[in-house]
């Protein structure tokens, strides 16, 4: 089980990402449309003034059950350990054990 502080930190990052996503997107479009170099620099400074944790690249996926940051499957939002346990307990509909 992950520390509660790290799980809360990730939640805070995802909230900041959602809050600033439109502003960040519009500033990036303005940079691409800017004609002069000074104009691009001023827009870039505005972009740099935004909180670091508002960038989407800083958000890391975590398992919903355990909070584990590694081996998290996007389809389920669960780590491989939890998927295995839940699949064996028939708690994931449509998931079957592979055999060939």
Swiss-Prot record:
It holds the Pfam family Ribosomal_S14. InterPro entries: Ribosomal_uS14, Ribosomal_uS14_bac/plastid, Ribosomal_uS14_CS. It is found in: Plastid, Chloroplast. One of its GO terms (cellular component) is chloroplast. Binds 16S rRNA, required for the assembly of 30S particles. Belongs to the universal ribosomal protein uS14 family. PANTHER family: 30S RIBOSOMAL PROTEIN S14, SMALL RIBOSOMAL SUBUNIT PROTEIN US14M. This is Small ribosomal subunit protein uS14c. The lineage of its organism: Eukaryota, Viridiplantae, Streptophyta, Zygnematophyceae, Zygnematophycidae.
